Amino acid sequence: MTIEQANQYFAALPDGFASTEQLRTAFTATVQKVQFVGVAGTAGKTVTARLLAAILHAQGIHAGLYHAGCRPLSERICIDDAPVDEGLLALTADALSAAEALPQDAAELAAAANCFGAAGCTLAVVELPDAGLAEALPGMPVCAVTSVGPDGVSRSVERLAALAAGVMRKESICVTAPEQPKSVLSELIVAAGKCGCELVVPDPEDITFLEAEKFASKVDYGGYTVPLAFLGRHAAGSAAMAVELSLALCRKGFDITDDAILEGLAAVENRSSIRVISQRPLIILDACRTPQQAAALLRVLNMAKVRHMSAIIGLVEEEGAEAFFSALETGLTPEEQKKDKSTMPGMSENPFDKVYLVTPAGGDDEMTARLTEKAKYHF
């Protein structure tokens, strides 16, 4: 295969679930020599994985990085902070296509792991859209569960937390996000206790914002001073997780210095799904899709003192829309709104003067009308 054919092969694979045995069978022998850090959760997986990989690179550890997502796979597998060798990935795709077909998530993870094994990586940081795939990975001294919240598939946050906890294993150290909902944290504590995994929760009180500009800030976490690309506790929480993951790896025998942690955190440019496309006029693109992510976006804009903006919101379904609009209006998640009785729909001060709703072309006109009415209730 060419690299274009390899990317097309993985992109065309169907969704679905693979058994642990199926995935293990797809691994080459060299994968057994790689230690993995699995990253599960609803939001923040990409940034947390990227930050940790940057720290490993700064330390000089021969490490791989795999991001889940929809970009071509060749752009989502990195080794030593550089895209994977195209010839290596093409050969890996050839081998996988000749064996038993796997669903897309499992096939991508197998391809990434096989590339890391062939390259002789010591460590590899991998995003896990399905935490159940973690069981097939040979060694995982440290793992992570990022922020857990509604995913638009009508599953409770407790159920989502239990699924994300599938990344844990006996005698591993799992770092989770600060300020998880109580119900989520309870599920993670129970899961960690059952499998004999140590759970580390960064203390939100250890996060201190030292200075702030319009779209940048400097944060101290436990003595580590970190420049962040954006304001907001979500970015600071991801940095705190990366620090704790590095310290956990130190406890597992890896040598990671404080200087490497600081250098790695400072080196990463894209730390969030929020992207500033233009400063003048100010144009921001955010891939938020959950109430938690909508609240995080609003908090960033409020901290930056941005006003008189227009928002263009694209929705493909009605499920979860009410909670999303409410969080984008108030900056509060559904759990926080239950505690704060002072918030009334349509009465909160926020950055948006106008809000435009966009739904897929050729979609359900009645659904669009219902979504519009929901939006009018808040803006």
Where does each model-flagged region fall?
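Short functional linear segments
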Residues: M1-G41, T48, A54, A58-Q59
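Aromatic/hydrophobic pocket-lining residues that form π-stacking "cages" and hydrophobic walls in ligand
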Residues: L52, A112, L188
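Hydrophobic alpha-helical packing residues
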Residues: L52-H57, F116, L249, A375
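ATP-dependent carboxylate-amine ligase catalytic core
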Residues: A58-P141, V153-V157
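Beta-strand->loop->alpha-helix junctions that form or flank phosphate-binding loops
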Residues: Y66, T176-E179, A191-E213, A229-R233, ...
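Acidic, Mg2+-coordinating active-site environments of NTP-dependent enzymes
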Residues: A119-L123, E127, A134-T225, A239-D259
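Nucleotide phosphate-binding/pyrophosphate-handling subdomain across enzymes
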Residues: L123, L133-A144, V148-G152, R159, ...
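C-terminal helical cap/extension that packs against the catalytic core
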Residues: E179-G196, L282-I284, F325-F379
